[in-house]
């Protein structure tokens, strides 16, 4: 395999093009980047691998399983990847190398975070990040309601620290939204009121929120944003897909791959489903110490008592309870926003920036589907482990269902 050096990266072109100023390299070194060129609508953009065979595998439910290693003679690159790791970069995206450099850059300053939307979820998330976000150097807030922004700016800058400095809260303008490392999007339209009788609240919000997100996706494109767009408002998974696609449309509405990479858009709705499954398991006396959740936030969720020792009946009951747990809160006359804001957003996002495992929806075969991953400088690293065949089939069914929805929407 050909190797080239570009800046501090070792590039290995496998169909993807090297930058023109790349020069030949004699031996592999870290970070090693495999360059591919794949359909940008249905392929990942930047992701970490630990085994050479992961570079070539199809984007199906199989990415949850331990990678299948071909019985080939020892290869220098195979041994190098096993020892040092690597990543795959899809050069079909015009911003591929810019994002690669940004994510690999050593962080010398605290994170700058922009929060869009100060409703119930946004306000709760802001409180959590103010108190817990020791990695955050600036919390920038934006909401069309100027009084709401000013209120949070005043009150949260009057909070005393407990054991670490607290990030200042400042109001930002629309034209500086993407001057940050992470943009957290919680704004929402058309949330059905309590008692409305709407069966699937998340899907009822989809079209209105999708329209609202178009302008923000266009701004991300215009500003050449290389950070993370964290989609939090519902329905998380299809809206994350919509943000990615809208950011990659030109003025004529054509997809051109000149916007965000798929992994730059991550959906945060799965954390609360894990928390609900754990709570329901505790109430029902079910061992969830090795439990997992996969798939979309809401309908299509897959909760499993154990990835390998999978009990279909027990897991089906857990899934049903987790999916409908929010309705119990609505039946009491309240909007169920506290647990999602804390579990899906605050805890998951802080786990991401700390390099810890976190629940989120990321791209797989052109749709955004939830599973556990860990963020690295080489992109997200998928958690891979043996899965019961029935559980794997459920995950693949959820993926295909979401694929049909997203591609028809």
Name each model feature, range by range:
Residues 1-110:
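Glycine/serine-rich phosphate-binding loop and adjoining beta1-alpha1 elements at the start
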Residues 52-70, 282-409:
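Long, compositionally biased stretches enriched for glycine and/or charged residues
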Residues 120-124:
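Hydrophobic/small residue at the entry helix of a nucleotide-binding pocket
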Residues 136-140:
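Short beta-strand element of Class I
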Residues 142-180:
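Conserved N-terminal Rossmann-fold NAD(P) cofactor-binding segment
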Residues 166-226:
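Rossmann-like NAD(P)-binding element
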Residues 233-306:
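Rossmann-like dinucleotide-binding core of oxidoreductases
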